[in-house]
Amino acid sequence: GVDVRCEARALRLIVDRHGPGQRIVGLVVREDMTEHHYRAEKGVILCAGGFVMNAEMLERYAPELSRGGTVPIGNPNDTGGGIQMGMSVGGRAINMHEGFLSVPFYPPATLTHGIFVNGQGQRFINEDAYHGRIGCALVKQTFPVYLILNVEDYTDYETASWLQAPVAGTGETLDELAAELKLPEGALAATVNTYNRAVDVQEDSLFHKRGPWLKHLDGPFVALNCTPGDGAFFPYFTLGGLDTTVDGEVLNNEGTIIHGLFAAGRTACGVPRRGDGYAS
């Protein structure tokens, strides 16, 4: 019983401002170069994706996501039109700075034995975390970012991994590797020594990496360049959107329901609303 209209563009919502509160009562749609007004008996549902394909909105709300070299993924029409339409009638948009950013460094699983370090040679996360959580932490670091591995754990990385991160350096010792990566003197060695002590007692008190993935880094070493923009593949999409009740009713800035207006999908800020907590 659904009347599907193709090649029709929703332009704006129709608002009835009479009475104690505004109500969405319809929609203006352009079809065949002509505007048509449609009455919505029960309401309008905005379900038009996020804004990952809108460079202007990304720059305004989530510049960290598009921080050089990351790759937007989604429908080409994820341009934020539904979110903006809801905002135009007072809908509250929340968590617009949040997004899912993947660091698809496994498979092979052996890469999880390594450690991520930032431009100061410091570790910043447990490497057995969900790849989206790692991505969220990675873009907040001082660049460059490297994944430090034993060469024996490199295995079939070149054929099995989606990451495509280039080799940034190799070394028989940590000092050799750090010099090639131009990291602060002594920083990488201190980080790896701390990590290896955690491996000895099978307890990562800093980031709580689990036992099966705790393995000594004892060389020879290889470093993968995981800096966005330097060759690695980092896909992302947005998580922010219109604030709604559990029934999908859009809320205004005061937290009051806008009657007759609903949002769903990425147009709404749904259950997965933070990059560091997203999982699929």
Predicted regions and their residues:
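Residues forming the flavin
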Residues: 1-280
